């Protein structure tokens, strides 16, 4: 059973069986939105158990994912991008295909992240800002997201909590009770994570890079997409070293036309790493996996390549300005603290590099959430939208 440290208690809901077009019958369910593609009672009970952690604001929700999301099948499905991921969700997780077109599934991530020991204890911390701008099509009008915290406890796997930007499946703030949004795409949540932590204290996050997307094509390896990889790591990796070994067994494909990603990961032993896919010829897709670790300069990361392979390219550390100011501020702050920080100091570093509504209008220019992970205690303290005086606490029961 996942231990929940949020002050909101999730109440169990009771449901009668529904036909394809029925809305949930329980009077305690706050929504009348449909879930057209779901007929299985367990799936319907799950998607109708979403909890708004602020009551009725529609800004941050929490859900425990209680059915099988078929990770083994996902790892063999050849998911090389968002289109194939959407197909997997429709064919393997839905009970029937939709009568209308599925919502567009998109994916992106700006962000800043770092790892360090807690200066007042033996705990290890990871800090993370998720930065991303959503604009209404053809405008500069910002659309606000719902954050969704997703608890999972797969059979034979590790318990975890991960965090999703609901806008990537076209859910706006307040979608759950807007009487319009179909809830079927909540089935995709395990594969939409942007960061998370498991019961072993292993945490992983994804951050955007400029340039062509990663495309590995080893005929002897199955192909996986960014978020499928992260789901695999949270479900199966206990440490950074195990995670690196798992990634080496797969072709990584990232399908953004003009962007790629790198992973930042850390664990409860104090280990940390940046995993990048590189190619010094920027006219070709990155295809060589590199795990960068073992020195304090790699404790923080933003949105340019840190690999020496990429250093002198336009997207590398010597020439790219994408996230450079944030990176320098993180490096400087960590150095001032001698690469150790209390949770409050870690939060302060996130505040320094957070981006507000008057900052960059680029895709990575708006901080949606900020987290201090305690990898030793398996907890996450989150603030949304730079509301630093208000936090949401999440946790996982530690492995015995």
Model-derived regions: residue spans:
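Non-transmembrane alpha-helical segments in soluble domains
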Residues: 231-234, 244-247, 331
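N-terminal mature-domain region immediately after signal-peptide cleavage
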Residues: 19-238, 252-253, 335, 339-400
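C-terminal motif of bacterial Sec signal peptides marking the signal peptidase cleavage site
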Residues: 13-17
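Long, charge-rich alpha-helical interaction segments
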Residues: 314-343
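Secretory/export targeting leaders with adjacent low-complexity proregions
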Residues: 245-255, 263
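Extended amphipathic alpha-helical segments with heptad-repeat/coiled-coil character used for oligomerization
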Residues: 257-311
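Bacterial N-terminal signal peptides that target proteins for export
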Residues: 1-5
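Hydrophobic alpha-helical transmembrane segments of integral membrane proteins
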Residues: 8-9
């Amino acid at each position: 059973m996942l231990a929940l440290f949020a002050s909101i208690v999730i109440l169990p809901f009771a449901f009668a069986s529904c036909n394809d077009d029925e809305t949930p019958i329980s009077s305690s369910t706050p929504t009348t939105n449909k879930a057209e593609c779901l007929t299985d009672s367990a799936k319907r009970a799950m998607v109708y158990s979403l909890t708004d952690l602020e009551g009725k604001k529609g800004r941050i929700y929490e859900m425990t994912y209680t059915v099988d999301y078929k990770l083994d099948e996902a790892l063999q499905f050849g998911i090389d991008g968002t289109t194939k991921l959407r197909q997997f969700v429709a064919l393997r997780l839905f009970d029937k295909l939709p009568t209308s077109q599925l919502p567009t599934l998109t994916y992106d991530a700006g962000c800043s992240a770092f790892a360090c020991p807690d200066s007042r204890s033996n705990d290890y911390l990871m800090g993370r800002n998720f930065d991303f701008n959503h604009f209404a099509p053809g405008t500069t009008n910002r659309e606000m997201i719902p954050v969704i915290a997703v608890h999972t406890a797969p059979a034979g796997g590790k318990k975890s909590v991960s965090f999703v930007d609901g806008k990537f499946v076209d859910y706006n703030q307040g979608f759950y009770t807007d009487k319009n949004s179909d809830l079927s795409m909540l089935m995709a949540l395990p594969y939409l994570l942007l960061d998370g932590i498991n019961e072993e204290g292993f945490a992983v996050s994804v951050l955007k890079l400029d340039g062509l997307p990663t495309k590995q094509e080893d005929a002897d390896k199955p192909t996986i997409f960014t978020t499928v990889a992260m789901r695999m790591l949270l479900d199966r990796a206990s440490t950074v070293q195990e995670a690196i070994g798992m990634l080496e067994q797969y072709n990584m494909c990232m399908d953004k036309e003009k962007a790629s990603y790198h992973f930042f990961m850390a664990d409860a032993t104090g280990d940390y790493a940046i995993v990048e896919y590189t190619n010094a010829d920027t006219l070709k897709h990155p295809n060589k996996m590199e795990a960068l670790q073992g020195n304090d300069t790699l404790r923080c990361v933003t949105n340019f390549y840190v690999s020496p392979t990429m250093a002198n390219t336009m997207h590398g550390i010597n020439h790219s300005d994408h996230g450079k100011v944030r990176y320098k501020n993180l490096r400087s702050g960590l150095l001032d603290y001698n690469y150790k920080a209390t949770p409050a100091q870690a939060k302060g570093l996130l505040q320094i590099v957070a981006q507000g509504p008057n900052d960059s209008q680029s895709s990575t220019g708006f901080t949606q959430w900020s987290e201090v992970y305690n990898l030793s205690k398996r907890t996450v303290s989150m603030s949304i939208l730079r509301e630093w005086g208000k936090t949401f606490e999440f946790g996982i029961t530690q492995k015995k």
